[in-house]
Amino acid sequence: MAASLVGKKIVFVTGNAKKLEEVIQILGDNFPCTLEAQKIDLPEYQGEPDEISIQKCREAARQVQGPVLVEDTCLCFNALGGLPGPYIKWFLQKLKPEGLHQLLAGFEDKSAYALCTFALSTGDPSQPVLLFRGQTSGQIVMPRGSRDFGWDPCFQPDGYEQTYAEMPKSEKNTISHRFRALHKLQEYFSVAAGAGDH
């Protein structure tokens, strides 16, 4: 499947220019495809993260009629059994980073994990959607740092004194959940290229 995509344009489904910028930065110059951002209105699916990613990717591929890459991000609070999870976008819109921090006010456990799933489709509905997952563990803290990237101000990765928002982009992009997922996507393409996609 990867070999059939090499050299082709893949539509990365996002309306967020910052996200495209970060993805291109992480993938670097050696990624064998061209990513082009396109905002597509997809239904808000419910369910487990993998199910949501597959449904979104299939629908995006149907609309684009070609190869697509869809990203889904979850922020999961362990004290809340994994919530907000895939619904983080809506929680963030209503509560802002301060409100996310407040959600855990009554809990000792402030641990959380950020999960990023990239779903890739060739655009052919008979081919399976491939999933590439990355996860980073951390703590939910009082928001600190720049406010230009979602919930970054209240997520402090384990082993670091800074929140995602306080870190230089170059550092964040070597440890983030998005980096880990994209690293798996890169590996998939390089293994497929090396093996002639057999």
Curated annotation (Swiss-Prot):
It catalyses: ITP + H2O = IMP + diphosphate + H(+); dITP + H2O = dIMP + diphosphate + H(+); XTP + H2O = XMP + diphosphate + H(+); N(6)-hydroxy-dATP + H2O = N(6)-hydroxy-dAMP + diphosphate + H(+). The modification N-acetylalanine is found at A2. One of its GO terms (cellular component) is cytosol. InterPro entries: ITPase (IPR027502), ITPase-like_fam (IPR029001), RdgB/HAM1 (IPR002637). It is found in: Cytoplasm. Keywords: Acetylation, Cytoplasm, Hydrolase, Magnesium, Manganese, Metal-binding, Nucleotide metabolism, Nucleotide-binding, Phosphoprotein. Gene3D superfamilies: 3.90.950.10. Disruption phenotype: Pups die about 2 weeks after birth with growth retardation and heart failure. Accumulates ITP in erythrocytes. Accumulates inosine in RNA and deoxyinosine in DNA. CDD domains: HAM1 (cd00515). Its cofactor is Mg(2+); Mn(2+). Binds 1 divalent metal cation per subunit; can use either Mg(2+) or Mn(2+). Pfam families: Ham1p_like. Its EC number is 3.6.1.66. The keyword Acetylation applies. ITP binds at residues 14-19, 56, 72-73, 89, 149-152, 172, 177-178. HAMAP family: HAM1_NTPase (MF_03148). Pyrophosphatase that hydrolyzes the non-canonical purine nucleotides inosine triphosphate (ITP), deoxyinosine triphosphate (dITP) as well as 2'-deoxy-N-6-hydroxylaminopurine triphosphate (dHAPTP) and xanthosine 5'-triphosphate (XTP) to their respective monophosphate derivatives. The enzyme does not distinguish between the deoxy- and ribose forms. Probably excludes non-canonical purines from RNA and DNA precursor pools, thus preventing their incorporation into RNA and DNA and avoiding chromosomal lesions. Belongs to the HAM1 NTPase family. Homodimer. This is Inosine triphosphate pyrophosphatase. It comes from Mus musculus (Mouse).
